[in-house]
Amino acid sequence: MCVECKACLDVCPRMPANTKSIISSDILGPYLTVKNVRSKKNCGRFQNGGAVTALLAAALEEELIDCALVMGEDRWAQKSYPRVVYDVSDLEKCAGSKYTSNAVLEPIQDVVKNVNNIALVGTPCTVQAVGLLRKSSNEFAMKLAHKVRFLLGLFCFEAFSDQLIPEVTRRLCVPSWRIDKMSAGDATMTVTLRDGGMKTIPLPEISGYVKPGCKACADFTAKLSDVSVGGVGSTPGMSVVILRTPEGVGLFKIAEERGFIEAKDGVKVKAIEKVGKLKLERNGF
């Protein structure tokens, strides 16, 4: 029931007054440093260097957070869903990229009733909403934002609806349970099967399954996060990690000092800017 608190207007990333910090020619957004990062631990079926899973594992094991709000996956149906994880074992089950997108913020109101500090992982649209919660002076918004200790953003050009999976299985003539993981790059969706086989689909052929909301998003690198992570511009086998805030740097240093991650320089920043600019221009900003 609406109580006319106006919190929704205060934090909506599609309101013109709220878009200035999101839409700009500065593709990377504000940041302190950029690194190539690889997990030093076996953290499950991670994507690229496994940086997100490793950072969250460090936060959980060092008791910096009570839980993490991430995207889980029904591996039989290949459908994603929001999941709250309280330990590293459950976290590892959620490792890896999901190309179908669902409302990761859906459980947050219930979660914050029982814990003090959470980490949240999301694509730029999710990060925009939580980032604006943090900036808001609205009482209701502040109650939620205060509980988000770490906000981790994922590079995202676009996401797909759940209807993508039936289309992929139809095109490849395989049931959904045979799919191990999917990855997108170079205008191609690569599907890795459980038996090690690989199949590909040109991305333009499945563009009709892109979520409509993605066309209203200008942010590729999740500018309002504490830490942004992605594969574009990285050294092979590693993730790009953009550290934006002192909180993000603190988490990174703890993870590095405790042996969860290793890092090195050499990120191809221009490659990130190229893809970010393409998204900005494609979506009409």
Residue locations for each model-derived region?
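Iron-sulfur cluster-binding cysteine motifs and their immediate structural context
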Residues: 1, 6-25, 227
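Entry/capping segment at the start of metal-dependent catalytic domains
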Residues: 14-52
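Portal/gating segments that form or line small-molecule/metal binding sites
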Residues: 46, 51-60, 64-113
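Gly/Ser/Thr-rich loops at beta-strand to alpha-helix junctions
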Residues: 48-51, 75, 120-130, 158-160
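Long, compositionally biased charged/polar accessory segments in the mid-to-C-terminal portions
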Residues: 63-66, 169, 173-285
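Cofactor-cradling patches in redox/metallo enzymes
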Residues: 107-113, 128-135
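A short alpha->loop->secondary-structure connector
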Residues: 135-153
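Short, conserved secondary-structure transition motifs
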Residues: 153-166
